Structure formats: structure tokens, C-alpha cells
């Protein structure tokens, strides 16, 4: 039986595979696939953005090899960054309660 961490890793892989490949290459997210992922899986984050260009800038910043697509490692950089931001927010909130 997989551990909680192993299940999380499996879920990340499954989500990446769910969105990649619709435009042809199943090892990368195209810009369209990235936008679909963001608007579906991270809808609360996307809806709270006041700047309509934020997703385009995120894609460019995450696309380290500048090929116009996100591979799995670049995708994980997004997930890691969001996890760090959420963790920091959680820590700040819990410290205010003390």
C-alpha cells in the first residue's frame, strides 16, 4: 500500500498526464494545456488574479528552456512554488494566533 507521500507523487504525475498531450506532445504542457490546468485545477488562484497577463508571465518564467512548453520538471517548479507560498501563509496565520 502506498504511503501518503507516494500517493501525492502519483497524483501529481496523473494531473500532469491529464493535461499534457492534448496538443500532441504528452511529455509537455503547451500554453493552451497550461491555461486549462490553471483554470481547472487552480481555479481559486486564477480567479483571484486582478492582472489578466499573470498566467502568460508565469508560463514564461516557468519555461526555463524557452521552448514555449512546460516539461514535468518545469511543472514541478510551479507546484513547489505554490506549496512554499501556501506553507508560508499557513505559518504566518498560525503565528498570529499565538
UniProtKB/Swiss-Prot annotation:
Range of residues in the leader sequence: none
Domain EF-hand per the UniProt entry, residue ranges: 8-44, 50-85
Modification after translation: Phosphorylation at Thr-5 significantly suppresses homodimerization and promotes association with NCL/nucleolin which induces nuclear translocation.
Binding, Ca(2+) 2: 63, 65, 67, 69, 74
SMART domains, A to Z: EFh, S_100
GO molecular function, one term: calcium-dependent protein binding
Gene3D superfamilies associated with the record: EF-hand
Positions of Ca(2+) 1 binding: 26, 28, 33
Further comment: Binds two calcium ions per molecule with an affinity similar to that of the S100 proteins.
Listed name of the protein: Protein S100-A11
Species in which this protein is naturally found: Mus musculus
